Amino acid sequence: FSATMPPEIHRLTTQFLHNPVRIEASAPSSTAASIEQYLVKVPHDAAPKRDALRALLRTQTKVKNGIVFANRKTTVALLEKSLRKHGFSAGALHGDMDQSARLKMLAAFRNNEVTYLIASDVAARGLDIPEVSHVFNFDVPIHAEDYVHRVGRTGRAGREGHAFTMVTREEAKYLRAI
């Protein structure tokens, strides 16, 4: 059983299982109507893209807390360092962290000790992070379902949410799938 099945896993099931059966309980996921979604065109180069993120964060005056998603763990670490260097309250969460470090960071985020959680997709699924006011996709997710799960961190229980996706010309192909 899997609540969601990425395309790679689906390909593996058809390759190794005999007569696999797929059961879908609902249509493909979509985002909540209470989430305002925005696209922000940004340069491809890393440093100007980080500059654009910091500028975007500064324009958002009503951020209670926010999750900044990146596609790579190395980008997560770089963004955390960059944001902290420029005076933002930020912490990292990714799959290479041990469980105690992840739990400590989640507690700090939930208790508003950290305003921005910089995360890989490990934080998009299955974690209980209530009342996230903003989501920022530093990278466009490669799979459309990941976009739904990332954006779904905000706008929960009918609350208003805000989601910003930074997109470079090179990432447009992923945006079309969303």
Please name every model-derived segment.
Residues 1-178:
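Conserved helicase RecA-like core
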